[in-house]
Amino acid sequence: MAGLGSRIMGAVRSGLIAPWVGLVAALSIQVLAGNPYNFPLYSHRLKTVLGYNQVQLSNLGVANDIGENVGLLAGLLCNKIPPWAILLVGAATSFVGYGVIWLVISQTINPPPYYVVWLVLCLGTNSSTWFNTAVLVTNMRNFPFSRGTVAGILKGYVGLSAAVYTEIYIGLAEKDSVKQLFFLTVGLPAACLLLMYFVRPCTPASEEGSEEHGYFIFIQATSIVFAFYLLTTAIVDDVFSLDKGFISKIFVGLMFLLLLSPIGIPLKLTWNAIRDDHCTDVQKPLPMETDRLEEPLLATEENRSGSKSVAETLSEALPSSMPGENETGRENVYLCVSHPSFIEDWDQPEILLAEGEGAVRKKRRPRRGENFKLRQALVKADFWLLFIVYFCGVGSGVMVLNNLAQIGLAEGLDDVTILLSLFSIANFLGRLGGGAVSEHFVRSKAIPRTVWMTASQTVMIAAHLLLASAITGSLYFGCLLLGVCYGVQFSVMVPTASELFGLKHFGMIYNFLTMGNPLGALFFFWPPCRVYL
């Protein structure tokens, strides 16, 4: 039994299995990272208990978005501390921030000043940036040849989190905002503490194999099944009013089983590793004396003394490619290394100059695809174009999401949980599809990923017009259409930024770009808050 246990632990720690264990754990953490999507579920109760008006509530929605997206500190620390420490900070901010909101809504403490509520809400939702940064940066480095696919899957599960939290709100919290906030205060940090050990950096594979591609397809397939299960349960809950019922709790249990279904990949890899190890032990040949390597009979004087030739010394001193060197310089170095007799034609000062240039490399700015620091990316037009496109796409989408309850009430819909579920599942499909489709076409047709951001924002115009038309049924269809287009922005922006500016400082660059979300929410929130005063 002890031998089997050691084999299992050795298999799990192996370079092939550990990245998949981390990815599966990251999927559940990404669901936790969607905790800011709970705001529509408790915002009305918060408004009633504290007596806020619509402008004050909309400003709290901005705090919700700022906390969700401003993660520069997490991006700065992701290269200095391990992923588990990043996740630990996220669990702590969730516990403190949502804990105070729970105490306020449950009327356990006296209502604090408005700015305190604003700050603690920002702190609680800021846990999302710590969760996102830890798992996204780690897994994109673990799977560098599948960045679009990995980003789409991870961001897709964040999009699904709204439907997951809605199911918890109906089945476990029994549509009680106080119980839902208690879950965010205690349950969310506890789940993070259980999973944070498994998210760790691993040595990436040299290339993407067909087996790895098949595993990604399996995760995508299970996530689609998971999404349609959530859609079905949301419709059943809405039609038959299953809150406070035994069936709704069964739905929640099945939901958690489907959430954990990708664990089949590391289990399969572990079983294969154990089986192969067992077969190797059985079939391993006995060591033979004739297998011992012998030294060559004839050894040169150079090998015995360990001395290096002048050509070898120059080849080590001179870099293979020096920034800014011309073709003549390359030819001279080549002749020196390949033909030592050519050294006689060089004067001693020229040799010293060549060695000096090799020892001190000339600095230059990074080019597209190389590793940029944030300050280097900030002076690039590509960076600001990507930021503005992301700002427009997610800003208008999050404006609708934050005002979904008010939009539903204005169109005669008392319960907006079904709208939140529809938006969440459509958001997931947009994130998953945007990552997979952009990855396929950038490889096969060399079509830039940003084409899909442009196309989705064009469709977004039609979605906003549908919501404004108030035609019968347009609210549901508009939410679905808007959710898909909204999700595409996330899954396309992430790999685009990594391919333009590299992975070394990706945490900082990613978190700066995501600030387009709260800035967009702040820019677009004034029209609706004036309408729904």
Model-derived segments and spans:
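Intracellular juxtamembrane helix-capping segments at the cytosolic ends
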Residues: F39-L41, L46, S128-I153, Y165-T166, ...
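Hydrophobic core of transmembrane alpha-helices in multi-pass small-molecule transporters
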Residues: G97, N110-F131, S474-V488
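Long, low-complexity inter-transmembrane loops of multi-pass membrane transporters
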Residues: A2-R7, V199-V379, L385-I388
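C-terminal ends and interior cores of transmembrane alpha-helices
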Residues: A92-N110, Y197, L230, V459-A470
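Cytoplasmic membrane-interface "Motif A"-like loop-to-helix N-cap segments
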Residues: N79-A92, H440-S456
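Glycine-rich segments within core transmembrane alpha-helices of 12-TM secondary carriers
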Residues: G67-E68, F145-Y197, E211-A234, A426-N427, ...
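Extracytoplasmic gate region of multi-pass secondary transporters
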Residues: F39-L46, Y229-S241, C336, R367-G369, ...
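Central cavity-lining transmembrane alpha-helices of secondary-active solute carriers
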Residues: N59-N79, V96-G99, L103, A163, ...
